Amino acid sequence: MRHDVLVYHYHLATRPCERFSRFINSSDYSFATVDTTNDLKALKVSDMKCPNLVNIQHHYKVWGSDKSKLNSLVDLASAIIDPYYAKMKEESNKDKNAWHSVWHERLDEQHVKYVAMDAYTSYEMYRRIVDMRNYLLPDPDEGSSHIAVAG
């Protein structure tokens, strides 16, 4: 199975993109990610909104983690998808200031790969969370509360 990920770096856009704006404002899609803080700031600077932006941290908590802290992308992906994702943290263990300082510039290959991996991982986690909820929620037409009692 193949998945395509579009990386649109709107910080470098020289003019507003009407198609992109319509896409992120569409009620047909939800956009899921981990920690929406910077996304919301960047969208605001670009004078854009994304009404269906989902912060996965508010929909899933890793069992046994500190209840007062939000889980990271790696923690969530390791718990929801596969423990293999714990290696992502080791691979991206770089100088945080240097790593984060270039997001407003043209992205190098490492950052583009990270963005694509982040996007796919967020998609897969949210898909699994939605699936889990769909299987756990009772069917409104079934169950003992819907059985007619003969009197």
Q: What spans do the regions from the language model cover?
A:
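Acidic two-metal-ion nuclease catalytic site recognized across multiple nuclease folds
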Residues: 117-151
